[in-house]
């Protein structure tokens, strides 16, 4: 809480510090448990977790998994960080070829590809880098491509309340390459069209033509 002078009170500062300590303790506890779990997995596939090449693998794998899923710790407001600006521009804005990496929630193997985002502002625009950060936040979770596509589009609506949003993701799934049907060249495309992109075929067609130029 701020005092009359405008400075944070010692109680507020102490509370923030306590929350950071709790978050750090929880993360450390999670890391220890995940390290033990990876050690168990390695052992159960028939490997010796004590041999030189694998001694630090459980710890490395646990840290990597925490990084791959760091999106669970992020919120949209934190990502936006006040980068929403008043602007009268009312024509299409497109950021295409945003690289994306995620983990399939079914087999915990990667899928990666590119995200194309278009929107038509309604008196507000979003800092361009924030579109990439929105993609990063949702892709750094256990995902399916269909849900990821919709989450990105919904976040754009929450951020700037545009006249319309279009999101297309084109990705390759390692669960189709490394196992199962083992189709190396297969790609999956998903889309989410909201507002004018859903209601107006010409607007939708313009977006699709522009992202594939």
Curated annotation (Swiss-Prot):
Gene3D superfamilies: 1.10.286.10, 3.30.1130.10. Keywords: Allosteric enzyme, GTP-binding, Hydrolase, Metal-binding, Nucleotide-binding, Tetrahydrobiopterin biosynthesis, Zinc. One of its GO terms (molecular function) is GTP binding. One of its GO terms (cellular component) is cytoplasm. It is an enzyme of class 3 (hydrolase). It comes from the Eukaryota. It catalyses: GTP + H2O = 7,8-dihydroneopterin 3'-triphosphate + formate + H(+). InterPro entries: GTP-CH-I_C/QueF, GTP-CH-I_N, GTP_CycHdrlase_I, GTP_CycHdrlase_I_CS, GTP_CycHdrlase_I_dom. Zn(2+) binds at residues 104, 107, 175. GO terms for biological process: tetrahydrobiopterin biosynthetic process; tetrahydrofolate biosynthetic process. The keyword Membrane does not apply. Its EC number is 3.5.4.16. Pathway: Cofactor biosynthesis; 7,8-dihydroneopterin triphosphate biosynthesis; 7,8-dihydroneopterin triphosphate from GTP: step 1/1. The keyword Transcription does not apply. Toroid-shaped homodecamer, composed of two pentamers of five dimers. Belongs to the GTP cyclohydrolase I family. NCBIfam families: folE (TIGR00063), PRK09347.1-2 (NF006825), PRK09347.1-3 (NF006826). This is GTP cyclohydrolase 1. It comes from Ostertagia ostertagi (Brown stomach worm). The lineage of its organism: Eukaryota, Metazoa, Ecdysozoa, Nematoda, Chromadorea.
């Amino acid at each position: 809480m701020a005092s009359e002078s405008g400075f944070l009170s010692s109680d507020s500062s102490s509370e923030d510090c306590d929350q950071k300590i709790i978050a750090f303790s929880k993360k450390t506890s999670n890391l220890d448990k995940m390290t033990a779990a990876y050690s168990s997995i390695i052992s159960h596939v028939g490997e010796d977790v004590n041999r030189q090449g694998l001694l630090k693998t459980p710890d490395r794998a646990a840290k990597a998994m925490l990084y791959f899923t760091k999106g669970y710790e992020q919120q949209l407001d934190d990502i936006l960080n006040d980068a929403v600006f008043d602007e009268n521009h009312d024509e299409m804005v497109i950021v295409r070829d945003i690289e994306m990496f995620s983990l399939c929630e079914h087999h915990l193997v990667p899928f990666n590809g590119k995200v194309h985002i278009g929107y038509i502002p309604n008196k507000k625009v979003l800092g361009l880098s924030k579109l990439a950060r929105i993609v990063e936040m949702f892709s750094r979770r256990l995902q399916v491509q269909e849900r990821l596509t919709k989450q990105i589009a919904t976040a754009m609506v929450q951020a700037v309340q545009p006249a319309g949003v279009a999101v297309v993701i084109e990705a390759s799934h390692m669960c189709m390459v490394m196992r199962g049907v083992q189709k190396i060249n297969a790609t999956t495309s998903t889309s989410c069209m909201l507002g004018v992109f859903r209601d107006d075929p010409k607007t939708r067609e313009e977006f699709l033509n522009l992202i594939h130029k």
